[in-house]
């Protein structure tokens, strides 16, 4: 799965985590538990189980986001697309095993009128979200390892 490479706001990040890919996957795949380890997420609820086509709703920032899983390949890749307040987002996490644990790559794109008008602020917000999310994921996965 790929993010929208033509979108006006794209953010990427990577982090090394001292936990096996299966542990990192379990943290990412437990959608309902996201608010317990990621302070940027206030609510999260998955309906239909973790599979392509399933929908989850979550609250991050001022709006509630409705997202649909586009890719679910345990414990390698998870990706979704979603909409909130006129913003179209596409997000992907890729996990690669390493000698010390897991390298996680995250990428997200934002598109929509408001993103096009406020490109700079949108890019900064998106990059801060990727960086903060990866740091929180690392902390939780290493705690569970």
What does each of the following model-derived ranges do?
Residues 12-13, 32-64, 73-77:
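Short beta-edge strand/loop motif at the mouth of beta-sheet-based domains
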Residues 18-22, 70-75, 94-103, 144:
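A short, structured loop/turn motif at beta-sheet edges
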Residues 12-14, 55-57, 79, 92-94, ...:
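Beta-strand secondary-structure signal
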Residues 1-45, 136:
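Hydrophobic ligand-binding cavity/cleft-lining segments
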Residues 13-15, 65-71, 82, 90-97:
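Hydrophobic/aromatic beta-strand elements that line small-molecule binding cavities or substrate pockets
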Residues 24-28, 34, 56, 69, ...:
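Hydrophobic pocket/interface hotspot
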Residues 8, 62, 86-88:
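Glycine-centered tight beta-turn/hairpin loop motif at sheet-sheet or coil-to-beta transitions
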Residues 83-132, 137-139, 143:
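Beta-strand/loop substructures that line and gate deep hydrophobic ligand-binding cavities in soluble
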């Amino acid at each position: 799965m790929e993010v929208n490479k033509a979108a006006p706001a794209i953010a990427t990040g990577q982090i090394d985590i001292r936990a096996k890919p299966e542990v990192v996957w379990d943290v990412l795949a437990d959608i309902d538990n996201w608010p317990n380890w990621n302070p940027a997420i206030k609510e999260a609820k998955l309906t239909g189980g973790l599979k392509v086509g399933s929908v989850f709703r979550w609250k991050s920032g001022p709006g509630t986001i409705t997202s649909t899983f586009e890719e679910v390949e345990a414990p390698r890749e998870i990706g979704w697309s979603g909409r909130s307040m006129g913003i179209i987002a596409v997000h992907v996490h890729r996990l690669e095993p390493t000698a010390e644990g897991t390298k996680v790559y995250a990428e997200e794109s934002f598109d929509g009128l408001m993103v096009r008008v406020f490109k700079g602020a949108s890019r900064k917000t998106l990059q801060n979200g990727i960086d903060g999310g990866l740091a929180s994921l690392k902390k939780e996965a290493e705690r569970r390892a």
